[in-house]
Amino acid sequence: MRVQEKAPGKLYLAGEYAVVEAGYPALIAAMDQYITVTAEKSESGRLYSSQNPSLVLAWKRESGQLSFSMKHPYASIESAMRTAETYAVEQGCSAQGHYHLSVDSELDHAETGTKYGLGSSGAVTVAVIKSLLAYYGLSKHPLVIYKLAVLAQMKLEMTGSFGDIAASSFGGVIAYSSVNRTWLSQAMARQSIKELVDSEWKNLEIRAVQLPMSIQLMVGWTGASASTDQLVQHFLKIASFYKNFHRPWAWSSRHPC
């Protein structure tokens, strides 16, 4: 058995930092560059990525859990695998046997490995989950994929709005408002993955947008990668400062008259 799925990268058109806070929208476009994941039934479990051609990881099942042979740089892939496998079991699938998972990326420079900034972490999470849902014969509805991918990244304590995941899951151009992370963290502590996927998520909005035909996108690349986590933390620090600066009590205490 062999299945292959792909997920596009993303580009924020507006609201890249506003959307980090629940309830604030962003406009995001999926790109025509992809991460492709192939899952093929095999005698032993293996994981390969074009980003590290010389590294082929072995994995196996121990007490119903995935176990990798060594430490590796594929935290997003492993978390996506674990999340998809757990969901498959909760859906009544028999997650037994092994498969070879192959990841091929168009979202980084082929020679240097430098990322283009098109949401490779989100895209690879989505592509892995799509491929394993197909492997187990489960629904690949974009909202199901989005929720599973978000849960996989939440387990890694990744920051950001998950807008890249939304764009990779739904494709096209979307208007997106992020889920309330506090609510989701609390829900994850008391609900199964299936229950979370089946529930309505607080503040989450994903809507397809049709741009005018007269609009053409021209994308430039700086040639340097950037850390989403670091940029988001910097934004949140500034946002927190200005929220405190504008609090009414701060002004009234300075101007008692």
Descriptions of predicted regions:
Residues 2-14, 18-20, 28-95, 106-111, ...:
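C-terminal nucleotide
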Residues 6, 106-128:
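Glycine/serine-rich anion-binding loops at beta->alpha junctions
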Residues 98-100:
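Residues at or immediately flanking beta-strands
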Residues 102-104:
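Solvent-exposed beta-strand sheet faces enriched in polar/charged residues
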